[in-house]
Regions:
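Short, flexible loop/hinge motifs at secondary-structure junctions
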Residues: 1-199, 268-269, 402, 525, ...
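Catalytic center-proximal scaffold of phosphoryl-transfer enzymes
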Residues: 2-3, 129-130, 140, 167-169, ...
Length: 538
């Protein structure tokens, strides 16, 4: 009996131990699960904190990516760079001017107004004050002295021009007895109106285009301006004029630019959203797209074209670039991938921007942070590019310089990037993934000295559209959006080639471009032509 009792107790203890082990195992699993949950919550909280910090910086902070490195600060990247090329630091300081430290010379009044007409105003003594206060004799003017410069503005004024044309008759034929019925009449030639049955002129339509697409002034505000001048020009009338002239005149110049652009070997592209009302079978809130295609740094006159489409589908880019063969610099949009006969270059400014956005607030100079190190790698590449431009390198010299100086930096960057293990979902993880996913296209620029390190030129070219969009908000119709793309093209082409935008628009309208013009004739309307320069420079 005693033995059975002892065995029973042993079995009971074993069962108790097993139960305790199960409880411990369950508790351990629960603790591990809770730890994972807490860690996930912590990471989510950190990601949300970074997102709030990022959005706050975007909303209230500076948008510049420029940074000043602390003098004498040696960091991880500097060590790798010095090992790659020990002569690097000996070369750069003598040749690169740091913009932040360069003081601009003060501009004089003559510099400010060198392109503005001037005249003299003589202030004379009133007639009744020209008698000598001592003896009363009439005084004589013996000279004049300069007092000051004044800049004066004459507000815009409109006028109605009543156009007549003269008719000429041959007096001999009128009295001829041999041919009494063959009288000769000749009328002076008159250019056809800009718009049939309209009082619009190129100066008025050109001004409306200039105000909206250069100055960002919506048509409703222009309507108010015209009222102040006593002219009842409605926004609908102005819109119709712009659309008519863009489609019937400027489009022919636009198409010529398009043909010229596709003949280049180095292009850049960017795109942005635009809201367009009354698109067939589409909600007004649906995003439409404005594309910007431009020539690269090929040493030829710049060409910039805006292009409106309803969607961002890949075939739009393929259709617009049909016939182009060469290098295309873009942002990260995948729609540019696998375009025929095109080698894609990705933008290093975007890579730098991703790392910049991943830097915590107030930690811009904490060189132990991977995000700061990533920015430094990118900044060194841009330093090299500035150095090359300062040296006026040819395309071949720039290619060799990049292979000698920038390729070691790139190799160090990719090795460093492979060692990064950022937490999933963080801004640093996005920066690392963005660069890793585009490694091949980020290296393409090394192949040709004409290729650019960044897509900043196209981003700068599309910025006037994004600024103007904040004012006019939307296009009322697809036709209006397409016309806007054409006029924006003319405005940006004028600016890129150093022409006065209003003068260039009125010049184009005065020439009445049409589909019967040859490319040789359209070439004379291009902003780089001597004819356009003579008529449209300030």
């Amino acid at each position: 009996m005693a033995g059975n009792s002892k065995d029973s107790k042993i079995l009971a203890y074993k069962d108790m131990i097993n139960q305790l082990n199960k409880t411990i195992s369950t508790q351990t699993e629960l603790i591990q699960s809770l730890q994972k949950t807490l860690e996930a919550d912590r990471l989510e909280k950190e990601n949300l904190r970074q997102q709030i910090e990022y959005l706050t910086k975007k909303l209230f902070g500076t948008s510049s990516e420029k940074r000043k490195d602390i003098a004498g600060q040696l960091n991880l990247f500097d060590e790798a760079e010095q090992e790659a090329d020990p002569t690097w630091e000996q070369e750069l300081p003598d040749d690169i001017t740091v913009p932040e430290h360069k003081r601009k010379a003060r501009r004089t009044h003559a510099d400010l107004f060198k392109n503005v007409p001037s005249c003299d105003e003589i202030i004379s003594l009133p007639e009744e004050e020209r008698n000598c206060p001592t003896c009363g004799t009439q005084m004589e003017c013996i000279g004049k002295e300069f007092v000051r410069h004044e800049f004066r503005f004459t507000p815009a004024k409109g006028k109605v021009v009543n156009i007549y044309r003269e008719t000429y008759k041959c007096p001999e034929c009128a009295i001829s007895e041999e041919h009494p019925d063959d009288q000769t009449f000749v009328k002076a030639p008159v250019q056809e109106p800009l718009i049939p049955e309209s009082y619009a002129s190129e100066s008025v339509v050109g001004w409306a285009m200039h105000q909206k697409y250069q100055n960002g002034l919506p048509l409703n505000r222009q309507e108010e301006d015209w009222k102040q001048l006593g002219v009842p020009l409605s926004r609908a009338t102005l819109a119709n004029w712009i659309i008519y002239c863009a489609e019937n005149y400027l489009r022919h110049v636009y198409n010529y630019f398009h043909r010229q652009l596709r003949m280049r070997k180095y292009l850049m592209a960017d795109e942005t959203r635009v809201q367009v009302l009354n698109e067939p079978e589409r909600n007004p809130e649906t995003d439409s797209w404005m594309w910007l295609f431009r020539s690269g740094e090929d040493g030829l006159p710049p060409i910039l074209l805006y292009h409106y489409t309803e969607t961002r589908a890949k075939f739009h880019a393929a259709s617009f670039l049909q016939g182009f063969s060469g290098y295309l610099e873009t942002d990260g949009y995948q729609g540019y991938n696998n375009l025929p006969d095109i080698k894609r270059c990705s933008c290093w400014a975007h890579v730098r921007r991703y790392f910049t956005d991943a830097i915590p607030k107030g930690k811009e100079y904490d060189y132990s942070l991977p995000a700061v190190q990533g920015v430094q790698f990118c900044s060194k590449l841009f330093d090299c590019e500035r150095y090359s431009k300062a040296k006026n390198h040819t395309a071949e010299q720039r290619k060799q310089f990049r292979l000698e100086k920038e390729k070691p930096i790139l190799e160090a960057f990719w090795n460093w990037l492979d060692q990064q293990r950022p937490n999933k979902g963080t801004r640093l993880a996005k920066a690392v993934n963005y660069a890793q996913n585009r490694k091949d296209t980020l290296m393409t620029y090394l192949e040709d000295g004409h290729c650019s390190l960044s897509n900043n030129l196209s981003e700068n070219a599309i910025r006037p559209f994004t600024v103007g969009r904040k004012n006019w908000l939307f296009s009322a119709s697809p036709k209006g959006a397409a016309s806007s793309a054409i006029v924006y093209t003319m405005v940006e082409m004028a600016k890129a080639n150093d022409l006065n935008t209003y003068k260039y628009l009125t010049y184009l309208l005065s020439q009445r471009p049409n589909d019967k013009m040859s490319d040789e004739q359209l070439e004379q309307l291009a902003p780089w032509s001597e004819t356009a320069k003579a008529n449209c420079q300030n």
